[in-house]
């Protein structure tokens, strides 16, 4: 009973992370306008830079050690704010008017580029440099939107992102798959879009996770600008 109480107390340690996350930049190009049965189709391409705190080489806070100095429990002093690698994405978005509703769907792929780090070991007592390669991700979604007036619309959609396993390679070693790093993150989304002017809109999006890999909920704000 004493041991169980000690273990429970150790598990209550809490850390957080503040700071700049990964910065992304994307551009859209309209391939086709809506005509007859054909939806408006937009090509999207973008890149994400690893400007946030990477989840590798973090400083650790050791909470408990055994009598032989073996670490029983440790947590990062600060949580990561990014994934640590460069990423590029390409996708298609389609919109079709079905008065009074608007139907939309999207499909895309995210590619992650390998990157080296001074330490990729999860043991705070060791330093092992190496490379990390995140698995590619396929994302897709579909939904419907209703316009309240010329400026405001409400949308309801489903989105999913399926990611392959990541791989790591210690310096001088071979690539090895990371067990449990694959994911299937699906969510139900509720959004409100408000047109600020002819070129700029404000998008508010609330997401509710549907799978274990998805966050319980997310809240995002975007301000797209159209030339």
Task: Enumerate the language-model features and the residues they cover.
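Transmembrane beta-barrel architecture of outer-membrane proteins
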Residues: 20-26, 40, 85-89, 135-139, ...
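Short, small-residue-biased leader/transition segments that mark boundaries at the very start
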Residues: 2-3
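Surface-exposed loop/turn segments flanking beta-strands in extracellular/periplasmic regions
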Residues: 62-75
């Amino acid at each position: 009973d004493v041991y169980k109480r000690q273990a429970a107390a150790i598990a209550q340690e809490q850390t957080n992370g503040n700071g700049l996350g990964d910065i992304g930049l994307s551009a859209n190009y309209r391939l086709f306008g809506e005509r007859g049965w054909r939806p408006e189709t937009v090509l999207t391409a973008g890149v994400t830079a690893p400007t946030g705190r990477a989840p590798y080489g973090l400083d650790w806070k050791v909470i408990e050690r055994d009598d032989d100095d073996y670490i029983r429990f440790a947590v990062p002093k600060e949580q990561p704010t990014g994934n640590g690698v460069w990423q590029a994405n390409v996708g298609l978005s389609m919109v079709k008017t079905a008065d009074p509703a608007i139907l939309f769907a999207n499909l895309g792929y995210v590619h992650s580029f390998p990157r080296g780090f001074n330490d990729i070991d999860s043991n705070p007592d060791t330093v092992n440099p190496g490379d990390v390669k995140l698995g590619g991700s396929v994302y897709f979604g579909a939904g419907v939107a209703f316009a309240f007036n010329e400026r405001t619309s409400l949308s309801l959609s489903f989105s999913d992102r399926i990611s392959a396993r990541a791989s790591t390679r210690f310096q001088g070693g071979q690539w090895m798959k990371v067990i449990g790093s694959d994911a299937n993150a699906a969510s139900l989304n509720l959004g409100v879009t408000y047109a600020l002017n002819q070129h700029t809109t404000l998008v508010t999006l609330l997401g509710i996770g549907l799978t274990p890999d998805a966050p319980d909920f997310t809240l995002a704000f975007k301000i797209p600008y159209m030339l």
